[in-house]
């Protein structure tokens, strides 16, 4: 049986941290801070990185970290690849050009020293077909279920293909943010833990809501989150 929650995390240490203009039009939860110097924002991000890393390690969870790149403002959110417990990994297609740049050759080389690369769908970026790994797909690993909210960064057809090829059942649905557009990433609105699923059902379109509600209640206790709470990223949890 697959372990639901990992005992080993991969983190990227920020070199710089700033708003990503290339992702802003699909990410309505991103905020630009105008009254604070860029270097101060980066200092805060670095302090938060070390605080989180230390807190995780104190819980007995192993953390592997690599240094990010200044040309990649979202490098601290490494959702361009997935590793699996059978020591394989896959690389995914990213929408924003500067997110594609996150796939640094030295990072891939480092990862492939431990994990066998079995698939790389980066070529789909040229066709504007995007599937942004564990941000597009929220995994119930034990029960082999993937939850996916359709968005410009989560292509429905590619998601169906991926789940079929990797033997996962798919729970596919549509969402609507406080701005009226699809929520850019599924992991903004939900997470799957060992015993609990946290999810904001209110942002799932009514025609999909009861279907998703039944699925999340099938194997877990459910913690319902409000739309206001996910604006504060309460849906992003490990």
Region spans (language model):
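The feature marks the mature, well-folded catalytic cores of soluble enzymes
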Residues: 1-238
């Amino acid at each position: 049986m697959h372990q639901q929650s990992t005992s080993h995390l991969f983190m990227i240490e920020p070199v710089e941290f700033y708003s990503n203009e290339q992702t802003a039009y699909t990410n309505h939860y991103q905020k630009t801070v105008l009254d604070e110097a860029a270097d101060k924002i980066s200092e805060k991000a670095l302090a938060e990185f070390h605080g989180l890393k230390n807190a995780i390690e104190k819980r007995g969870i192993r953390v592997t970290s690599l240094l990010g790149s200044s040309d990649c403002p979202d490098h601290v959110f490494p959702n361009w690849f997935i590793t699996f417990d059978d020591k394989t990994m896959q690389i995914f297609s990213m929408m924003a050009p500067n997110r594609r740049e996150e796939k640094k050759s030295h990072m891939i080389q480092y990862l492939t020293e431990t994990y066998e690369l079995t698939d790389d769908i980066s070529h789909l970026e040229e066709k504007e077909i995007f599937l942004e790994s564990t941000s597009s797909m929220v995994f119930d690993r034990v029960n082999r279920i993937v939850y996916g909210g359709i968005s410009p960064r989560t292509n429905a057809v590619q998601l169906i293909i991926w789940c079929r090829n990797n033997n996962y059942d798919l729970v596919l649905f549509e969402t609507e943010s406080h701005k009226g557009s699809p929520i850019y990433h599924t992991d903004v609105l939900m997470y799957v833990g060992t015993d609990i699923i946290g999810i904001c059902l209110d942002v799932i379109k009514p025609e999909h809501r009861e279907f998703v509600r039944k699925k999340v209640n099938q194997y877990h206790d459910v913690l319902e989150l409000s739309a206001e709470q996910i604006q504060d990223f309460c849906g992003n949890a490990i």
